[in-house]
Amino acid sequence: MLAGLIIAAYPFISNYLYERRQQDIITSYETQQKTDTETNEELENVKEYNKSLAAANVTVTDPFDPEGLSGFGRREYETLLNVNEEGMMGYLEIPVIDVRLGIYHGTGENVLKNGVGHLKNTSLPIGGEGTHAVLSAHAGLPEKKLFTDLELMKEGDIFYIHVFGETLAYETDRITVIEPHNTEDLKIQEGKDYVTLVTCTPYGINSHRLLVRGKRIPFVEKETDKEIEKRKGSQWMRQYLYGAAAGIFIIFLFVGIYKIIRIRRI
């Protein structure tokens, strides 16, 4: 019975430990910020990179396509916004679905299993006119929630990018579902400052991509957690609660049958 309860509780325990680890990584990132001079120099380099990227009109690929991992200015790309030398650019915060995850270079499988990946050939996430950063993560993993609750977001929801000591605010202005090869909505648009969050959908099938796009808005001090109404109805939570309940029911059923058999044998 104990083993069954442990198995049923595994997703919740695993996700809790993962989120604690992410918080430690974010705290470490915030303490490793560069000096003002270094930051200004780095940001200028990133702005130049983003300008060159926009001018090059490069091809944007599906974040989950292993064949599309090559990127514009690859060597330079890996060194930019690499504060802790571990590929972490900054972190993403989505208050309404209680997400705080590190953002890393690239969308390789190792990145997507452990955090949010920045899609190569899209703008680095420092904001500015004529930029469009694309951030992706998995949904539906049994041991981590990641972007599973992205489907709960609505137009008007605000999310934040924390990078180099600054907080950039984005208001969700468009939510769409596309086929994986249709990446037109991920391209840079002149004069616009966008960030698009991407994950697989529908839950458990993953045949399409869910895009949650945010437009840049002025940052104002965030509400406290108590004032923010968290979005409810998580499929991740619902699925594993059902699984846990079913597991516990089966355990008690077998225990009950076992006791009945023993009594009849006496």
Region spans (language model):
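C-terminal single-pass membrane-anchor helix
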Residues: 227-266
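Solvent-exposed, non-transmembrane regions of membrane-associated and secreted proteins
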Residues: 1-237
